[in-house]
């Protein structure tokens, strides 16, 4: 389903930012996304879904050295609650659960790409 809603242009956005009226609430429109992505593991887990269309808990655990089972479970639950990923449980023995991007999560891929390009451009200036 294609989104037909018209959004402001970049130039309109910059003008509204300077006037302090980007959203009806008057706050930064990026804040909700940044709040959803807070935490050490969320962006790393989302990156895994860029690699795999769907992934199981064990695959994610294997690909994310250092993450505990509890932290991975909590991260997946929070990303699901925020609507960025889905959880599908199959009625099989042994039980099987797979995770993947929702449409809203998949819509973040161009955003992640832009952030990656910015990171490469400024990598020598970043103090990590």
Model-derived segments and spans:
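Recognition helices and adjacent regulatory flanks at domain boundaries
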Residues: 1-29
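Canonical helix-turn-helix DNA-binding module
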Residues: 58-90, 94
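Short, charged recognition helix plus adjacent turn
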Residues: 128
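N-terminal helix-turn-helix DNA-binding core of bacterial DNA-binding proteins
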Residues: 21-67
């Amino acid at each position: 389903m294609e989104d037909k809603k018209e959004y402001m242009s970049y130039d309109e956005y910059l003008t509204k930012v300077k006037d302090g009226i980007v959203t009806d609430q008057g706050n930064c429109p990026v804040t909700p996304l940044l709040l959803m992505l807070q935490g050490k593991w969320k962006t790393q887990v989302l990156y895994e879904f860029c690699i795999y269309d769907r992934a199981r808990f064990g695959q994610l655990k294997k690909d994310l050295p250092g993450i505990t089972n509890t932290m991975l479970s909590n991260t997946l639950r929070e990303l699901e609650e925020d609507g960025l990923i889905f959880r599908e449980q199959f009625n099989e023995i042994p039980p099987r659960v797979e995770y993947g991007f929702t449409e809203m999560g998949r819509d973040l891929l161009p955003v992640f790409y832009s952030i990656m390009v910015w990171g490469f451009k400024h990598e020598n200036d970043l103090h990590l």
